[in-house]
């Protein structure tokens, strides 16, 4: 109130007082997000002595959020494995489903972390987008940075920027198209936040259900998610040094 933090909730306001309200947008967005259906058992896609991959359902956050009561894959996985250590090296957006990889011992962290930071692994996604893709394949390349918060939920938004951005490279291949939609495969050569979502929307092909980047609200209301799925990952194994997909 009048430039000072108010500590007494019962204090009376005087006429002409200036009131500034602080809003925690992260907590607000988390509270407004739909509550996901929590699976009884997480599906394990791959497991050996060093690595384990889970199939993350859409709607389930990768890790704990500001809403401590909201379920997340990391905590569910720990519980399912009986408290075994899990090293988290990447994440998927809440509404993105698919492959999520963890290390099972700390001694494998450096080897795996370097592959992520140096972009030495390949991550493949399937996306359903609005519109008919004209080119059967191509490469999308730009520098991505934050554009601030957008929409009624004040979600963090990213896009191509002229300065201060990080290089992002996405290859795509058209799999099928019809009824005003296209099914495509995307391969990431970098791992920037919202990279595929931004690159496709900037080409005029927003992911179906992705209201933050241009998909009509009716699609999200109908589907309850955006149509992006991480279907494969190729990584060099920390023990055998062979490629594992």
Regions found by a protein language model. Give the residues of each.
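RNA pseudouridine synthases
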Residues: 1-245
